[in-house]
Amino acid sequence: MRKTRVTALGDSLTKGVILNERNRYSVSNRCYMDIIGNELDMQIDNYGKFGCTISSCSNILERHAEDISSSDYTFLEYGGNDCDFDWKKIADHPLDMHTPKTGLKVFSEQFCKLIQQIRDLGSKPIIISLPPIISFQARPNR
């Protein structure tokens, strides 16, 4: 029996980037995509990319269109970097109006377009929601 094939597109969470014990970013050897693949016996091609936004995913889509078209499912995890702000600008001008890297309207339009492009390639898009941000200090005993 053939393994279910998945292509994963997204940002550093998809890639499995963590802050290691030396306070440096590195790719975890237990990324959640690897765990899903092992637990559900799926072949997952992970094209997550550090810092990726919905605007930059069109290049990734073009580069991996063949993999997507041969995948049963395509996991999409975007939004974490899109909703980020220019924090230096906010610190320098805290009373000004500030907008995220990608506005809601643009994000929605580009995400809907991405979903349709994946469908057009013959894969079923699966949208993955961002995990909640929980400070490590909020749970010191865990």
Where are the regions that the model predicts?
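Serine-esterase "nucleophile elbow" of acetyl-processing enzymes
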Residues: 1-48, 64-70
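Active-site loop signature of alpha/beta-hydrolase-fold enzymes
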Residues: 12-15, 52-54, 81-83, 133-135
